[in-house]
Amino acid sequence: MGGKESILAGQTNQDVLYGEALDQFGPALERLARAYEADSEKRRDLSQDIHFQLWLSFQNYNSRCSLRTWVYRVAHHVAVSHIIRERRTFLKLVSLEELDVLPDKADAQSAANRRMDLNRLSELIQRLKPLDRQVIVSYLEEMDAASTGEITGLSPANVAMRIHRIKNILAKQFHQPLQQGGNHAE
């Protein structure tokens, strides 16, 4: 029974690590899925895939990096694989559904403007190349350049430079009139 107890101990540790990750990063994982997939059904599938792969990955977690870095590394890898798979099937991305935002107490117009701005920003982020999307989503999740570099394989200096460049591109595109077709930063 020593082998069975060892397996159960491994599963328990895997479950504990997954539970910790979910407690700390659950909402961030949902935001990440939203940044990579506009279609609500595909986003649910992506989110489930992220959670499943994350749970599986804890079999190999060795604490050489922080839990946060591990979670984002796995989640971004799954999301990028999803994008590649979707592009191979030539499926057209659909518009992002209305974001779940807390109601603005000021007035209905400012709440509507905020939702429109968030939708516009999400659409622009979705048009970025996967690596740039990964960098900006990490930035928006308040990860430092070193942590983002661990996830992406870029140097912290390269991450900082990309963040600056992406922010400038997004700001410029955000203030331009909406254009149909074409991918930004590709």
List each language-model region with its residue ranges.
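Internal acidic/polar
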Residues: 2, 89-114, 144
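C-terminal edge and immediately downstream basic/flexible tail or linker adjoining helix-turn-helix-like DNA-binding
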Residues: 2-9, 16-18, 91-94, 151, ...
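A short, charge-rich alpha-helical start-of-domain segment used by transcription regulators
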Residues: 6-31, 44
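Amphipathic, Lys/Arg- and hydrophobic-enriched alpha-helical face
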Residues: 21-40, 56-57, 125
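Structural recognition of an alpha-helix C-terminal capping motif at a helix-to-coil junction
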Residues: 45-52, 56, 65-77
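Arg/Lys-rich amphipathic alpha helix in sigma70-family domain 2
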Residues: 73-94, 114
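DNA-recognition helix of helix-turn-helix
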Residues: 76, 146, 150-177
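Amphipathic alpha-helical segment used for protein-protein interaction
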Residues: 105-136, 141-146, 150
